[in-house]
A protein has these predicted regions:
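PRPP-associated nucleotide enzymes
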Residues: 1-360
Length: 360
């Protein structure tokens, strides 16, 4: 068996007060307009007991550590390694009997490895008598296989939901599902967070006077309309059509973008092919500059090279998926953290309070 991989313990915060929203000695509470978004404010003192714990797989332990630091909790100790034949081995290395446990693990590339880790960790926690297990899945792999679009194919996202439930998960916390109806595939409660508060706050600070939010396809119109409303901006849509077989898609821009700053909004950037084509169509339609933002930076294949060589001014993503070294070194890619958003949701679930206050 190979050497175990152990998440390091994050020491408790030294001053876990009310953070930016707190009234400090001799200082008045700042105006609401100057405060950070609710999802990014430091929480009130987390209850320092051993009845709630946060663990992480290897998919995004940096995000898990940030969440723990935000809440003033240590990261739970777990051993994750492989046997010589490639089988995954996990062991929970501390007592979880009667604890409210949160397991942070996006099922990103390599998807099957991270999914198997998650299933085994859930099973280990259940057999160790954890009182409740909440799977925190910032990026839900297989979400794009949510229906039968061809004969004799599986509905993979439904199968994954069943596997998580069968393994012993009592609750799920997810961020920006590709298809919101996936919540209905679960037989357990699902809290569906949106990264919009983090992304809206980032672009509000830029104070674009002529912003138009753009949906890259018809399926994303509702998401773009919601974002445009929060940004008090115009809305445009790019309609892709293939006029003939074996003929390149023609992209029609619906809406006024001439001389304006355009912001392409999507939930996932995978190969970045659609993103770059949308950017080119907007520039050809007279857009002054084009930005893009998405929650999940899958960035597979030639994505980073395409972004680098494109006319995009900036691509803003979140850390639901860790970037590769090439992604971190690409100056056009900017990362905003969702650790505060997820941390607030975890605290609300543990304290049995409403999670909806985190929504825009």
């Amino acid at each position: 068996m190979d050497t175990a991989t152990k998440p390091s313990v994050v020491p408790p915060a030294t001053a876990p007060g009310d953070g930016d929203g707190a009234q400090q000695a001799g200082k008045a509470t700042p105006p609401v307009a100057q405060q950070k978004p609710l999802s990014e404010r430091k929480p009130k003192l987390a209850r320092q007991d051993d009845k709630w714990k946060i663990f992480s797989g290897t998919a995004n332990d940096a995000l898990a550590k940030d969440i723990c630091e935000f809440l003033g909790l240590p990261l739970g100790q777990a051993c994750i390694s492989k046997f010589s034949d490639g089988e995954t081995y996990v062991q929970i290395e501390e007592n979880v009997r009667g604890a409210d446990v949160f397991m942070v693990q996006p099922t990103c590339d390599p998807v099957d490895v991270h999914l198997m880790q998650l299933l085994l960790l859930i099973d280990a926690l259940k057999r160790a008598s954890a009182r409740r297990i909440t799977v925190v899945i910032p990026y839900f792999g297989y979400a794009r296989q949510d229906r039968k679009d061809k004969p004799r194919v599986p509905i993979s996202s439904k199968l994954v939901a069943d596997l998580l439930t069968t393994a012993g998960a009592d609750r799920a916390l997810v961020v920006d599902l590709h298809a919101p109806q996936i919540q209905g595939f679960f037989n357990i409660p699902v809290d569906h967070l949106f990264a919009s508060p983090v992304l809206v706050d980032y672009f509000r600070k830029k104070q674009f006077p002529d912003l138009t939010v753009v949906s890259p396809d018809a399926g994303g119109v509702e998401r773009a309309r919601f974002f445009a409303k929060k940004m008090d901006s115009a809305l445009a849509i790019v309609d892709k059509r293939r006029v003939e077989m074996d003929v390149t898609e023609v992209m029609h821009v619906i809406g006024d973008v001439k001389g304006r700053t355009c912001l392409i909004l999507d939930d996932i950037i995978d190969t970045a092919g659609t993103l770059v084509k949308t950017c080119q169509a907007l520039l050809e339609a007279g857009a002054r500059q084009v930005y893009a933002c998405a929650t999940h930076p899958v960035l597979s294949g030639p994505a980073i090279e395409r972004i680098s060589q494109s006319g995009l001014a900036e691509v803003v993503v979140t850390n639901t998926i860790p970037l590769t070294e090439a992604g971190r070194n690409e100056p056009k890619i900017k990362v905003q953290s969702v650790h505060g958003l997820i941390g607030r949701a975890i605290q609300s679930i543990h304290e049995e309070t409403s999670v909806s206050r985190l929504f825009l």
